[in-house]
Curated annotation (Swiss-Prot):
UniProt signal peptide: 1-27
Principal localisation: secreted
Keyword Secreted carried by entry: yes
GO biological process: neuropeptide signaling pathway
UniProt-recorded name of the protein: FMRFamide-related neuropeptides
Keywords: Amidation, Cleavage on pair of basic residues, Neuropeptide, Secreted, Signal
Role played: GYRKPPFNGSIF-amide may be involved in olfaction and contraction of hindgut.
Modified residues (Phenylalanine amide): 39
Tissue expr: Olfactory lobe and accessory lobe, olfactory globular tract, olfactory lobe cells (at protein level). Widely distributed throughout nervous system.
Amino acid sequence: MCVQTRMLVAVAVVLVVLAVLSDPVSAGYRKPPFNGSIFGKRAGGDSLYEPGKALASACQVAVEACAAWFPGPEKK
């Protein structure tokens, strides 16, 4: 075998080894799930999540808790 043939065989072997080693890397990649980023959107807001109602509900819970912890003055 001459030197050029040996060099050609060596380069071919290196390319084949690189191709074999790099193939599993691309197979490990997985696309992320769609998660309904387009579907399932609602045009109107849900009345349960309106900012005014949320604040009113939080205040109501706080008033009830404070009334239970700090009762009013006793009447004689």
